[in-house]
């Protein structure tokens, strides 16, 4: 009986040592977005990272926080989510052009500004995270939007297609036809 108890304690101790580290990793020149596979340091606005069970030290990075939230809601996830980190846009020195490489906060406790008149790094509407609710309130006063927690962010804010403006891809059809004409189609 003593041996069985000692064995069980030893196994439990080993399992505790094997707990996966889910601390946020800083952005670096090799960090690319999960969806876009583009270098994240080349894009403005806040970023996100998701740590998955069984993939230690290899979080999925996202070029926009809205992409991070969208990933959480997609049914195709292959691994359980252990941690979700987003860039605190209220951190000292954080700007839209340079949101910071290591000012990560727990996405589950952040305050988000949703519906602000500002675009994220991929040119789509962004949900903007803050550790301090007062900083979120000040941002919303300047840029519009509503303040809410992660679970309250509506799917329409992160899963709906982005609408193009007149100055965006308004001539997409014309350019596509020109390519078809050149290709003999």
Name each model-derived stretch.
Residues 21-29:
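Short, flexible, mixed-charge glycine/proline-rich loop motifs
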Residues 33:
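Short cysteine-rich clusters marking metal-coordination/redox-active sites
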Residues 42-45:
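Short, non-ligating residues that shape and space the ligands of small metal-coordination modules
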Residues 58-105, 112, 118-121:
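Mid-length scaffold segments of soluble, non-membrane domains
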């Amino acid at each position: 009986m003593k041996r069985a108890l000692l064995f069980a304690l030893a196994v439990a101790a080993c399992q505790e040592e094997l707990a996966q580290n889910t601390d946020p990793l800083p952005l670096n020149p090799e960090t690319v977005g999960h969806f876009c596979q583009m270098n994240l340091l080349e894009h403005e606005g806040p970023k996100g990272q998701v740590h998955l069970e069984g993939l230690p030290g290899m979080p999925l990075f996202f070029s926009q926080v809205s992409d991070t939230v969208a990933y959480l809601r997609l049914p195709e996830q292959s691994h359980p989510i252990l941690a979700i980190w987003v860039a605190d846009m209220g951190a000292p020195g954080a700007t839209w052009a340079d949101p910071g490489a290591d000012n990560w906060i727990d996405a589950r406790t952040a305050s988000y500004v949703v519906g602000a008149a500002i675009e994220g790094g991929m040119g789509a509407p962004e949900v903007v995270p803050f550790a301090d609710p007062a900083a979120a309130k000040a941002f919303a006063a300047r840029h519009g939007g509503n303040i809410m927690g992660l679970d309250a962010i509506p799917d329409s804010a992160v899963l709906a297609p982005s609408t193009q403006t007149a100055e965006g891809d308004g001539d997409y059809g014309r350019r596509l036809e020109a390519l078809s004409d050149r290709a003999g189609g």
